Curated annotation (Swiss-Prot):
Annotated GO MF terms: translation initiation factor activity
Source species of the chain: Neurospora crassa (strain ATCC 24698 / 74-OR23-1A / CBS 708.71 / DSM 1257 / FGSC 987)
Described purpose of this protein according to its UniProt entry: Component of the eukaryotic translation initiation factor 3 (eIF-3) complex, which is involved in protein synthesis of a specialized repertoire of mRNAs and, together with other initiation factors, stimulates binding of mRNA and methionyl-tRNAi to the 40S ribosome. The eIF-3 complex specifically targets and initiates translation of a subset of mRNAs involved in cell proliferation.
Name this protein carries in UniProt: Eukaryotic translation initiation factor 3 subunit L
Name of one Pfam family that matches: Paf67
Family annotation (InterPro entries): eIF3l, PCI_dom
Similarity remark: Belongs to the eIF-3 subunit L family.
Length: 474
């Protein structure tokens, strides 16, 4: 059993929704059941009141917090979530309630992580500024509020309690998931919370910068249209955004483009049927994903779906052209697009309020790592434009064209040669893949002589005509 399930509610002043108050209600109910014959009417009234209270708390957990909410409200919201999850996880036996709606579980996990993310960013900003003594004092007194450990503990506890990973593994083997669900996992409330907690872990680990672990969490979920997350538009979009971004940061650009392309095509084809608030919430993420595709295509030129290609040209046409040219002029474009499209990274530990200058901005840290990769590949387009003109070429001659030292050029060529080999996911876990050559230009160094070969793939016009005819007459 996880530490969260064994832990008690936070030690701050008890509010009406605290764990202690909830346990008192449960104990009162037990005593009334023992004397059911003497006080049946009182028991029914207590049960009805308790059920109404829980239902209202379930509904409230999915409601977004006001963006301008003060620190006390953020603390209170954290306490409310702790109280609710403590009750769901620690009750004697599963809570026999149905979620208010089919997408309620996603809304709860989504809002829970959003508040954790926004609170962490807010706390870090207050620490860096160091001029609000009152809020700094409050944050010092409550270092574990919206802590990374407690949030991860909730998500892992919900997954463990629902046995959702065992259920998903059974489904992959074409077995009955009910056989391994247990008394908690058989309840829709636990099953849905556990399932979307897996998507939540993908998101949290990405925010913390652990991209490999983020992808590892989805080992038991199949990325296809039949998956449970695909039924909720916001969950569908979020999953592919964070998977694609993790692939991009791991330099698996082909897989990143594949993930981004899938969801963007899906959104473009279903936008006329999606009129709810969940669809409206992904509009900004949609533009961010186009920015990420522009970055990935600049690193690894590839043919895109016509719908995506057209939208990309409309949104980022000028920037994409500069990225594809490469050179120092492309650096500020890469930085601008990354800042626009990256998640709001957070630190796993509270900031240092005593030494504000010692706090590192997580976004700046990951931007620095990303820009190191950009600088390594900065001259790729220029180098390739020369190599395409020859079948063999002297290293010193190419260095003269580029106005760099031969040994520096040799280092670039070796690094970029290695970059053309990438893992490409086909099946199994998202970290797995087949090592393939993702470039149409290959070369080998023999001393100072560069041997170049180019594979040109002709456009499949038949497929192009069929796609456009089907869209015209659909």
């Amino acid at each position: 059993m996880s530490a969260f399930q064994q832990a008690q509610a936070p030690a701050r002043a008890i509010d009406p929704d605290s764990d202690v108050e909830e346990e008192a209600l449960v104990n009162d109910y037990k005593e009334q059941v023992q004397y059911e014959e003497d006080d049946a009417e009182s028991t029914q009234m207590s049960l009805a009141a308790q059920t109404d209270d829980i239902q209202s708390r379930l509904a409230a957990a999915a409601q977004p917090l006001d963006y301008s909410a003060g620190l006390e409200v953020k603390f209170s919201s954290y306490d409310s979530y702790c109280s609710l999850f403590h009750f769901i996880l620690n009750s004697e036996g599963p809570v026999d309630l149905e979620p208010p709606s089919y997408y309620w579980a996603w809304d709860v996990i989504d809002e829970f992580i959003y508040q954790f993310n926004s609170f962490s960013s807010y706390r870090a900003r207050i620490a860096r500024q160091g001029n609000n003594e009152e809020e700094i004092a409050m944050l010092r007194e409550n270092p574990n509020t919206w802590g990374c450990y407690s949030v991860l503990n909730v998500l892992y506890s919900l997954i463990q309690k629902s046995q959702i990973t065992e259920q998903l593994a059974a489904m992959k083997r074409n077995e009955d998931p009910a056989a391994v669900a247990g008394e908690y996992g058989s309840k829709n409330l636990y099953k849905m919370l556990g399932y979307f907690s897996i998507i939540g872990l993908l998101r949290v680990h990405t925010l913390l910068g652990d991209f490999s672990l983020a992808l590892k969490t989805l080992d038991d979920i199949e990325l296809n249209k039949k998956a449970m997350f695909a039924r909720v538009m916001a969950a569908h979009f979020t999953t592919y955004y964070y998977v694609g971004f993790s692939y991009m940061m791991m330099r698996r650009y082909a897989d990143a483009i594949r993930m981004f392309s899938h969801i963007l095509v899906y959104v473009s084809r279903t936008k006329n049927f999606q009129k709810n608030a969940q669809y409206d919430s992904i509009t900004k993420k949609n533009d961010q994903m186009y920015a990420l595709i522009a970055i990935c295509v600049a690193f690894q030129p590839t043919r895109l779906d016509d719908t995506i290609h057209t939208a990309l040209r409309e949104k980022y046409g000028d920037q994409l052209l500069k990225l594809q040219r490469g050179g120092p002029e492309a650096l500020p474009i890469y930085e601008e697009l990354f800042r626009t499209a990256c998640p709001k990274f957070i630190s796993p530990v509270p900031p240092n309020f005593d030494e504000p200058e010692a706090n590192i901005d997580p976004i700046e840290h990951h931007l620095s790592v990303f820009m190191d990769e950009v600088k390594t590949n900065m001259f790729n387009p220029t180098i390739k434009s020369y190599l395409r003109l020859y079948t063999t070429m002297d290293l010193k001659k190419l260095a003269g064209f580029l106005e760099v030292k031969p040994e520096e050029l040799r280092g670039w060529l070796m690094v970029n040669k290695q970059r053309t080999k990438q893992l490409r996911w086909t099946d199994g876990g998202l970290l797995e893949g087949e090592l393939v050559n993702v470039s149409d230009l290959d070369y080998a160094l023999q001393g100072d002589l560069i041997h170049i070969s180019e594979a040109k793939v002709g456009r499949k016009l038949v497929d192009w005509y069929l796609r456009n005819l089907s869209r015209t007459y659909a």
